Design a protein with these regions (language model features):
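Hydrophobic Val/Ile/Leu positions in short beta-strands of Rossmann-like dinucleotide-binding domains
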Residues: 47-48, 73
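Long, compositionally biased stretches enriched for glycine and/or charged residues
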Residues: 196-342
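Conserved glycine-rich cofactor-binding loop
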Residues: 51
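N-terminal Rossmann-fold NAD(P) dinucleotide-binding loop
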Residues: 55-56
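Rossmann-like NAD(P)(H) cofactor-binding subdomain of soluble oxidoreductases
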Residues: 126-192
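Conserved N-terminal Rossmann-fold NAD(P) cofactor-binding segment
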Residues: 70, 74-110, 125
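N-terminal Rossmann-like NAD(P) cofactor-binding module of classical short-chain dehydrogenase/reductase
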Residues: 114
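N-terminal mitochondrial targeting presequence
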Residues: 1-30, 34-36
Length: 342
């Protein structure tokens, strides 16, 4: 037994040496990465309304996701913007992104401008009144951002997002493809989570969208939904499912959250950050976002590939007769609302 000790000692020493060399190599690679990151000019993302819950959640999500950008928190309430920016910057010391308070003029020269500012709908308030109030807010923001960088992309998050995206495009002067809205991206995520619970399949492997006008006139594209390359509704666990109940659950989700804690912001924050990341990194990923669909003649929550130039392409979606009827209702509602602000 004694004659094996030198071999054991040698093996232990060799193992320690290899671990030490691996650690040195890891540190060198990290330092090289940090050096390379330092030479790459950071892109800028500005969050308008960053002093509020949705804006701050969006800014934090950008940092937490490791997006290598300078994130500016901009708000008419300067103290709120400063507080949120300082708090979020504390989370950036191990991440490639940075965060600070910014001005509207700086925001106008950003690569991506995310708008989360806007008035909330009051109990019993007609939707038309909310649009009127937010029209004035969005127009004021666009005036404050001027001159806007010609290559900038605007991401509208404020509601009613379909109409406000249209207003932002008209008042900013940017091409339609460079102005989009968060639309039904979050609603589609909620849908996929519910379907994942039913089928046992990861939500990332379920392709199903909420479409149309974000809000009352949105609908589920059941006939185009897929799972594993096959129609979703052919999945064995979907045979006896009440589709209307799923739709109602998606529609009620925000109200349940608002009733419990006052407002929603984490979900939409991560969605907005993901869309901004796609715009910055030219990912060409497909999202159900508000984009101008030529065949509809209006902005609409519809699947589109997103890249550094904004909307790269919008897709045709297979609909049945009932779904197409809901689509036409949504188109008419959006066009009617937008026509008042031409």
């Amino acid at each position: 037994m004694l004659h094996t000790l030198p071999k054991l000692i040698y093996t232990s020493q060799l193992s320690s040496l290899l671990r030490a060399r691996a650690l040195i190599l890891t540190n060198k690679l990290y330092n090289v990465k940090q050096s390379l990151m330092a030479t790459i000019p950071k892109q800028r993302v500005s969050v308008i309304g960053g002093g509020g819950n949705v804006g701050a959640s969006t800014a934090f999500a950008l940092i937490a996701k490791g997006v290598p950008a300078e994130v500016l928190v901009v708000d008419v309430v300067d103290k709120a913007a400063e507080g949120q920016a300082l708090d979020i910057s504390d989370a950036s010391f191990m991440m490639p992104g940075t965060c600070r308070k910014g001005s509207f003029k700086e925001a106008g020269q950003s690569d991506v401008i995310i708008i989360t500012a806007g008035a909330r709908q009051q109990p019993g308030e007609p939707r038309s009144n909310l649009i009127d109030r937010n029209y004035k807010i969005i127009k004021s923001i666009m005036d404050s951002l001027q001159p806007i960088k010609s290559s900038a992309k605007i991401l509208m998050v404020s509601n009613p997002v379909d109409v406000l995206t249209d207003i932002a495009q008209k008042t900013s002067g940017l091409p339609r493809k460079q102005v989009i809205g968060s639309g039904t991206y979050l609603d589609s995520g909620r849908l996929r989570n519910v379907l994942s619970e039913i089928t046992g399949v990861s939500p990332t492997s379920i392709h199903a969208y909420m479409l149309g006008e974000h809000g009352d006139n949105q609908f589920t594209g059941w006939s185009s939904a897929r799972i594993g390359g096959r129609p979703l509704l052919e999945h064995p666990k979907m045979k006896n499912v009440n589709l209307d109940e799923i739709y109602e659950k998606i529609q009620r989700k925000a109200y349940v959250i608002i009733d419990a804690k006052g407002s929603t912001y984490y979900g939409i924050g991560i969605c907005a950050a993901t869309l901004a990341e796609a715009l910055l990194n030219n990912t060409s990923q497909v999202f159900p976002v508000v984009n101008y669909v030529d065949s509809f003649g209006c902005y609409m929550s519809w699947p589109a590939a997103i890249g550094c130039d904004g909307v790269e392409q919008s897709f045709d979606v297979k609909l049945n007769k009932e779904e197409d009827k809901k689509l036409q209702t949504a188109i008419a509602a959006i066009k009617d609302a937008c026509s008042k602000y031409d």
